[in-house]
Amino acid sequence: NTIISVSGNFDDTFFELLEKYFGTKKMLDTKPYLPDAPYISKNNIVKEKDIEQVQLVATFKGIDVMDESVYSLLVFNNVFGSGMSSRLFQNIREQRGLVYSISAGHSAYINTGVFDISAGMSPESLGEVAHLISKEINTIKRNKLTSAEITKAKEQLKGNYILSSESTGARMQGAGRSLLLNKPIYTQEEALKKIDAVNADSVAEIIDRVLDSSTMCISA
């Protein structure tokens, strides 16, 4: 099955070409095979190599692509680990200079998701960095986010979304991906309202869901 997404300056001729080359194609009456989401129990893996750097990643079970709490997750991670103003970057790299890089991010799939925290450092810093990451996780779970942090994160996300929407390529990809996953295609106004709807309770809930120590795996 094929989905064609178009954005930008086009006219009826384009639709005529689509109809000419794709209009006679019949949709297959089949459903894609969707295996159960894999689950790996809590695990720690350390592999030693004779190299000058250490790469550390801590992963947690995330949310799938259909989960509307993604907006709360984006707000949470904007504060926690996304970008140079995040807590992870400021407290571990900027203030202490213990890592070359550090960030957190989320990857969503059709039936599961992965939230990861990754960092690169010298071998002698591994223990302290792991301790500080754990400390940041415990701090944000215990104290949650302030209303000022949530407001600032929402404004940053809305600004980034508006800027990205100026690209016809980004709009094309977003619409195509939504159609492929049977998700609604939101207008810019609708998407901004989704971000605005995020509140302290929804952020606290997603923090507890994602930063669940029972699903954490660490590899270095």
Give the ranges of each region predicted by the language model.
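Short amphipathic alpha-helix segments
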Residues: R87-Q95
